[in-house]
């Protein structure tokens, strides 16, 4: 039975754009060559790392969703370790609850604002009321 997985890779952000693009292409090609089906590829882009990893202080983040029966994960993560452009990676199973939550967000949009978010608007209204007296 195939499950839905998400892998996040962090490529060294100090590399040239063409090297980063080639690394992402190589990873997606590797996933398909291992018998998995790539669903989505999301390039998040460059972000400052919370702490240096080796000499890298900037990382290029990529999220890839794919379906697999789980047999390819060991080889996939071995290839991540061998690729010097990839400085970090994480692969997780997307469970049913997370997928349902994503569908709800897509269907209904962003969650409603809380009362804390609207507190500044209420203060402005009170100030306007006082000035009109």
From Swiss-Prot:
Q: Which residues form a coiled coil?
A: none
Question: Which BP terms from GO are recorded?
Answer: translation
Cited SUPFAM superfamilies: Ribosomal protein S6 (SSF54995)
**This protein's UniProt keywords:** Ribonucleoprotein, Ribosomal protein, RNA-binding, rRNA-binding
Q: Which stretches of sequence are listed as region Disordered?
A: 109-133
Statement: the UniProt record of this protein carries the keyword rRNA-binding: yes
Question: Which CDD domains does UniProt cross-reference here?
Answer: bS6
Q: Which GO terms describe its molecular function?
A: small ribosomal subunit rRNA binding; structural constituent of ribosome
Recorded GO CC terms: cytoplasm; ribonucleoprotein complex; ribosome
Q: Which family does it belong to?
A: Belongs to the bacterial ribosomal protein bS6 family.
According to its UniProt entry, what is the function of this protein? Binds together with bS18 to 16S ribosomal RNA.
Record protein name field = Small ribosomal subunit protein bS6
The organism named in the record is Chloroherpeton thalassium (strain ATCC 35110 / GB-78)
């Amino acid at each position: 039975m195939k499950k839905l997985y998400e892998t996040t890779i962090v490529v060294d952000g100090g590399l040239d754009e063409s090297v980063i693009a080639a690394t992402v292409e190589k990873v997606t090609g590797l996933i398909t060559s291992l018998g998995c089906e790539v669903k989505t590829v999301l390039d998040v882009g460059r972000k400052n790392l919370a702490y240096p990893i080796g000499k890298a202080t900037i990382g290029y983040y990529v999220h890839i969703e794919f379906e697999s029966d789980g047999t390819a994960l060991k080889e996939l993560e071995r290839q991540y370790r061998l690729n010097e452009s990839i400085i970090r990676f994480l692969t997780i199973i997307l469970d049913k609850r997370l997928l349902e939550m994503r569908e709800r967000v897509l269907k209904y949009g962003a969650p409603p604002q809380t009362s804390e978010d609207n507190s500044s608007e209420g203060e402005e209204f009170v100030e306007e009321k006082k000035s009109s007296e």
